[in-house]
């Protein structure tokens, strides 16, 4: 039971990291590799307590290094990351629980070519200058989840995530960026004795980003890209500023039924719909003007069918899902659409869990396709492609003895990337190894991960190495 | 309960979705311009369209290629599927016209700044003859060399005589203007008698360099790396009331400050100002400068949103949009003496100053 508890909370940690970082993504990606419980199916805080019954405290220190031997134009040559992560879960009484998380992360983007963004490609209106330099980012992130049973089997929960991050470039324009992000989710859930759970949640998120680029000499000219092919040269001035305001709302629903058709079959269905608006202002500190805005709107649906689950039997899981959204952007000066992007993403996967004595072997495969219709009207650029991807993986969990566990993962994948990767496909391969030992004072673990991305018919690769130490009690 | 909850959530989404902006009606890249170039001179009964005239569209918003095409026999040129943005439209052509002295070649210039409001745009630009030939403010070097200690004291200005006759600088004034023609910031005057003096001639097709200080900044301060050598300038500005104006070069004649109480050298805004060359018939700067006495006027500003300060009769636009302080760049007419009384069109930013010659 305790192991299940830890695993489920670690899943919470992973998902929270993905979805509630300094950029709030509107829709999450599902993978058959992960195990989803009632909470993290749509991040509904109403179900936190149903998945976790024992108090828990985890501490993690992690560091990573990524060498971009192959890179997009506005990517850094190397990324160094480090972070501290503290998580606690406590049952306050029989009906309520509280989970908190504090994360402090630093990252250093070395030899970053021109971009003043942490990820140039995540926005349609990205800021650049004309210098190459190192940019350091650092900041804390806080999360609080409160969960309570208000009536018999009727639950409610509130989750608040708040993060701040500051970035600084070491050469002119010495751009300083500050990003503030808030994410609030309120959820309701009902869980019957017969194993049927129904939930709904509403999410509001808001981000403010501020960039300040100063000028010393001539080279540091600031531009705002409109898409990826044309830019607006910002007026040369002593200080150029960019401000980003983004807010959005999403409603999600979920249904879970144990004993669906046959006793060992469970079905989980999740879906959501949301919209996000981004407004970008740029200019001098005294007269910033709207440089553009863009809106994303759409929804997703995901279904998981799980058979088995008891440790003594072979388990089987099937997943299928659809994500569909539409973006449109407009420059600030003129009431026209300058960028439009429609995405329809279909994914499906299968995994089987085979217990062999003290070993749990998981083998899985998933695939998907992203139907992209990206159009830049200002320069008439069209990227209309169906991008396929596939992944094969195996996870091995070994209980060496009563107090020690080992974990191995190996995966291979292939995906067709967007045009700005300038290659037809990328193959990835990765390996992860971890060991965890139980002591009288708690559990200490260490895990090591390597992942390599190799573009097709191109020189160079992206090599990622990471190591993490954890302490749980 | 479930029904009410779902209704509540959907209502909430609809409420918030309504707060977002509506999708615009038009896509970018479908702007069509149909431009006719016409020249009308009622005094001589001339009303013609300019055929085979090269029309240039320069995008003033985005970093984009310049579009060029030639007018047809109706004087019309069509540009299709352009991005929605501000364009500087220019055209020039030499026509054989009878302007009272027989048929002679006349250089006609047409220009306008176009702002899009609808998808299809049909309009006419009226060409005009060039501004009268004579002394022109040909180059303005104000931004300073590349440096990190805010050095800009190597400013200079260049005049050019575009006429076929000798011009005379005697008694002429050179002014830095305030926010209008009625507001004079600095006024400096050449020696000699205005209008009638003949001591300081400027030959046709020749340049005159006026330095803030006739000093070799390039070698003496910047070790020959950047900046300019102004020690051989034709004139230098001198203010007897400026105790800091120590670089008075004895080999270079002076243009003297005539503003009482003014204690600064002739230094102008690095990235924006208005300059006037006057014939010297009006030196009473208290009520501004008489527009009839203005020989040439140039307004420049690095800002694309700059609001005009000088009268449009003298200068319809402003040059130097995008020019960067401390870049070592300069602002010069497209061609020596090229003057349509629209500095937006007349001037281009050049990467380095050209002292006494055209780029």
Region spans (language model):
Chain A
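Outer-membrane beta-barrel "beta-signal"
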Residues: 461-473
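Transmembrane beta-strands of outer-membrane beta-barrel pores
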Residues: 61-67, 104-108, 148, 162-166, ...
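Short, flexible helix-coil linker/hinge segments at the edges of structured domains or between repeats
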Residues: 114-126, 203-245, 277-292
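Long, internal scaffold/assembly segments composed of regular secondary structure
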Residues: 230-353
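Outer-membrane beta-barrel channels and translocator barrels
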Residues: 91-95, 149-153, 191-195, 258-262, ...
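Membrane-embedded beta-strand positions of outer-membrane beta-barrel proteins
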Residues: 57-61, 100-102, 158-160, 186, ...
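N-terminal, post-signal peptide beta-strand-biased segments of exported outer-membrane/organellar beta-barrel
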Residues: 17-110, 123
